[in-house]
Curated annotation (Swiss-Prot):
Expressed by the skin glands. It is found in: Secreted. GO terms for biological process: defense response to bacterium; defense response to fungus; killing of cells of another organism. Its main location: secreted. GO terms for cellular component: extracellular region. The modification Phenylalanine amide is found at residue 13. This is Temporin-1SPc. The keyword Ribonucleoprotein does not apply. Keywords: Amidation, Amphibian defense peptide, Antibiotic, Antimicrobial, Cytolysis, Fungicide, Hemolysis, Secreted. It comes from the Eukaryota. Antimicrobial peptide with activity against Gram-negative and Gram-positive bacteria and fungi. Also shows hemolytic activity. Belongs to the frog skin active peptide (FSAP) family. Temporin subfamily. The keyword Secreted applies.
Length: 13
């Protein structure tokens, strides 16, 4: 689950 969050955050930031 965390991997998905980090992926989105990485794309945004």
């Amino acid at each position: 689950f965390l991997s998905a969050i980090t992926s989105i955050l990485g794309k945004l930031f």
